[in-house]
């Protein structure tokens, strides 16, 4: 094992596995360190570019196809980290209510070395999910915009409102009455 591989494994063990932020961070680390992708390459990926099946992750990048094999330890398994992030993205499209996603992710058991591998079977996602960016923008309240998720990958250099004639709806956090109603 090289020093780079050892450091990558140590970082994956140290990264939080709980919550959708932890899942996103682990997925980014896998793509940058295990797959050796640059920030620019990662930014262009869509969910459809990542296929998880039979203990491997196949990433179709502009530079070619990258295959990551599963690890015995779930904490350092790159395909499992990607599968967990893809599951969150699929929930964003299926359940537009943020509270549903938060409840499902919060109830998930924390990762351990004996956690089940999610990469062993096929990781299915909807057609709408496959079109969205693998790392969609997050608004100032920490939410992934449903508009972005449903519209798919766009050129991030041009603001959404400019691409759509200034008709973009702004996301707002729920007010106190909405929070107390749940």
Tell where the protein language model's regions lie, with residue ranges.
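Flexible interdomain linker/hinge and immediately adjacent N-terminus
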Residues: 1-14, 139-143
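Basic, Lys/Arg- and aromatic-enriched nucleic-acid-binding interface segment
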Residues: 7-39
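Short, basic (Lys/Arg/His-rich) helix/loop patches that form interaction surfaces
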Residues: 18, 154-182
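Short, hydrophobic/amphipathic alpha-helical patches that form generic packing surfaces
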Residues: 30-31, 84, 181
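Residue-level marker of regulatory loop/turn positions in helix-turn-helix DNA-binding domains and
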Residues: 17-21, 31, 74, 127, ...
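Internal, hydrophobic cores of structured domains that mediate oligomerization or house catalytic pockets
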Residues: 29-71
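Basic, alpha-helical nucleic-acid-contacting "clamp/cap" segments
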Residues: 58-159
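Short, cationic motifs built from Arg/Lys/His that form the positively charged side of catalytic pockets
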Residues: 24, 38, 66-68, 89, ...
